[in-house]
């Protein structure tokens, strides 16, 4: 949810509010008059589409300064220096992104302040305006850090069944393991796709024994390893997964199934598990994982 920071400046003019449902600010146009900032205008991007706001203030006979362009998504607006008269108008502005700073626009008179929030970016504005810009406030959203690409660790078990792959996500929130008489019958996972929660498909075939659930204290808890065993069973040419156990940064789950056959561990040091893949038919024959660095 966006954080609204109150407007700086005077109390006159008509209230306006661009809202907080934008992805980013991409351009700012400002004009200066004899009494201060004459008007301001913003371009936003939302779902890949550019939106331009009306002028906040009036155009008059002023000549606008060169626009401050923000090259989204690599660049974002993080701070604005504001000079204002508490009983009057916005006097001067300077815009600061994570990559550059605009020249100062207007007059350095009155009270100096900043619109900024640590580790957040500006995604919208509000304020008041009449014949000039009276006040200016902003909406802030958390900075989104691009995820390091995930990498798959090879699946272990046998090549029976059909291949499946849930892909890689931000994290794993829940694990469901179904059991059969001879091994693991099915698995299903709930993932964080930020901001949505995604429930993966059921891999294998559930039985009357149903599913056992392992719930993580997400996001502070994450899976760092999967331990298990696989073995050949009567009537099957290949092996089936007979037991699974999930290790997190806080705990180890109970074993799901019966420990029998060849033991294995899926793990990469300094990484967390963010997705699963494998092979299955009526039973789970093979399981592998996708991992990302824990710093993500």
Swiss-Prot record:
Sorted keywords for this record are: Acetylation, Lectin, Repeat
Q: Which Gene3D superfamilies match?
A: Jacalin-like lectin domain
Which SUPFAM superfamilies does this entry report, sorted A to Z?
A: Mannose-binding lectins
Location of N-acetylalanine modifications? 2
Q: What Pfam families does the database record attribute to this sequence?
A: Jacalin (PF01419)
Name any one GO molecular function.
copper ion binding
Task: List each copy of the Jacalin-type lectin domain by range.
Answer: 2-142, 150-293
- Show the segment(s) annotated as Disordered: 1-20
Q: Which domain of life is it from?
A: Eukaryota
Q: Any coiled-coil ranges, and where?
A: none
Assigned GO CC terms = cytosol
Instruction: Please state what is observed when this gene is inactivated.
Output: Smaller PYK10 complexes.
What family classification does the UniProt entry report for this protein?
A: Belongs to the jacalin lectin family.
The protein's job, in short, is: Polymerizer-type lectin that may facilitate the correct polymerization of BGLU23/PYK10 upon tissue damage. Activates BGLU21, BGLU22 and BGLU23.
Question: What is this protein identified as?
Answer: PYK10-binding protein 2
